[in-house]
């Protein structure tokens, strides 16, 4: 018989060395804040874009019901909300998140978002109301809407493929480590230059 102490074997699920709980991946709080705000605004823009398309265009299909409201204005307002978050997320991605941009599943959503915002800024909201569906900016905006949907799906697939549910859940974590509080964000950006 061996006199070595018996250590409990770690369970296969959620535990690390010596049976202690395994900590999942940690994402910087600034990334989580910018990513979360941008993601919510993108989702709102994408869904309202679907409603606007169904009401005013519908060449390739319509929603089965017409929702009341001025959806062009709602869509445009959400785009205005999205703009500063998208710019800040792009700045973050090009500085602190530069290494992550090497993965196409991370860079393509930003490019699609840039096309969506840029083409949206070129549009006149009265075009759709008056049936003017021939403008290049509108066609680019439709293409961007499709690309955003595909790019976000590819981004989610890439996250799940790379780190599974723990990585996806780490983006929803609301706790911040010491040195990663909102008061530390400016210092983090300066240090990374």
Spans of model-derived segments:
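Membrane-embedded alpha-helical bundles that constitute the cytochrome b-like, heme-associated redox core
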Residues: 1-193
């Amino acid at each position: 018989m061996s006199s070595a102490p018996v250590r409990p074997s770690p369970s296969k699920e959620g535990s690390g060395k010596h049976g202690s709980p395994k900590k999942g991946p940690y994402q910087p709080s600034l990334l989580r804040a910018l990513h979360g705000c941008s993601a919510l605004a993108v989702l709102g823009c994408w869904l309202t874009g679907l409603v606007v398309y169904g009401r005013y265009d519908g060449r390739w299909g319509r929603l089965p019901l017409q929702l009341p409201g001025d959806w062009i204005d709602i869509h445009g307002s959400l785009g205005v909300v999205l703009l500063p978050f998208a710019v800040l997320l792009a700045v973050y991605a090009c500085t602190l998140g530069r290494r992550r941009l090497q993965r196409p599943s991370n860079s393509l959503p930003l490019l699609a978002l840039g096309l969506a915002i840029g083409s949206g800024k070129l549009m006149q909201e009265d075009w759709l109301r008056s049936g003017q569906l021939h403008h290049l900016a509108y066609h680019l905006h439709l293409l961007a809407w499709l690309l955003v949907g595909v790019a976000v799906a590819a981004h989610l697939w890439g996250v799940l493929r790379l780190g599974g549910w723990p990585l996806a859940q780490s983006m929803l974590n609301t706790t911040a480590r010491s040195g990663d509080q909102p008061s530390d964000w400016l210092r983090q950006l300066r240090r990374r230059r």
